[in-house]
Amino acid sequence: MGNETSAHERAAALLGEHPGYRVLRALPPLAAYPITEPQGHVRTAAVIDVETIGLDADHPIIDLAIQRIAFDARGVIVQVGQPRQWFEDPGMPIPAEITRLTGITDADVAGKRIDVDEAVSLIASTTVAIAHNAAFDAPRVERRLPTIAGHAWACSCNEVPWPELGFDGRKLGHLLMQQGMFHQGHRAAVDVWATINLLGRVLPDGETALAKLIRQAEHPSVRIEATKAPFEAKDVLKARGYRWHAEKRTWWTEIATAREAGELDWLRDACSCTQPKLTPVTWAERHRG
């Protein structure tokens, strides 16, 4: 086996040196993950992923995975815990398209339940929960585990400036490929491990993606709702990056607090919006819709 592995590595190295080829490697097993000695203050995170029976907020979870990591003042991962994963019976048939996407069948989840006490303990004892698209995971996890409501969350998809770092897109699998890795996605435990590997990689500027994520996520921001903006302003607001909140029937955005004054000036001048609603946001409130 050792000789075969060495031969494969030599072949991969040879291909990797050729401009006409790109070599992708499978994610390493947990035992092979590189760990270094911590420097400075150490904090913890729970990396989380869920699979559900659909995209609606009230669609039940069928697959939950949590894996704890510890990271130091540099944003370097210095410890990786064992993954925990649970199936849960949604009480209804899993749609065929979800089974095609995830491979999870009715038989896999029949009679299964999430260990709520263990899941809550794993999350609540950390500094922050991390998910790749936390706006999807956070409200669904808090709905299933209400005692962790108000825990800090960070989003590795949207709170890391991937395009500015030279990456094309934000999808987990695509980001991995641009780092020379691949995984079989759409299972909670696999996606969690992929997220950990993505965040732990040192980027060309010498920092990890995790360092950038934590720095961005822990800073407060402000949610601006363009209340009473005229209907005619909708295209301008959309082009600016505002999103439509169907329930509140208003356009909204979330920006760094340092940009607040300039944004209010823009709303007044470009949209005749003089009474926007401002809500301070920390990582304990963010990603809840």
Locations of the language-model features?
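Acidic two-metal-ion nuclease catalytic site recognized across multiple nuclease folds
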Residues: 1-36, 201-289
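Conserved non-catalytic scaffold segment of RNase H-like nuclease domains
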Residues: 2-151, 158, 165-185
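Short Asp/Glu-rich motifs
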Residues: 118, 195, 256
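Short secondary-structure capping/turn micro-motifs that flank functional sites
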Residues: 115, 192-193, 253
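Active-site catalytic microenvironments for nucleophilic, acid-base chemistry
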Residues: 144, 178, 198-205
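Residue-level "edge-of-site" marker
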Residues: 112, 189, 250
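Acidic, divalent-metal-coordinating active-site segment for phosphoryl/phosphodiester hydrolysis
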Residues: 190-198
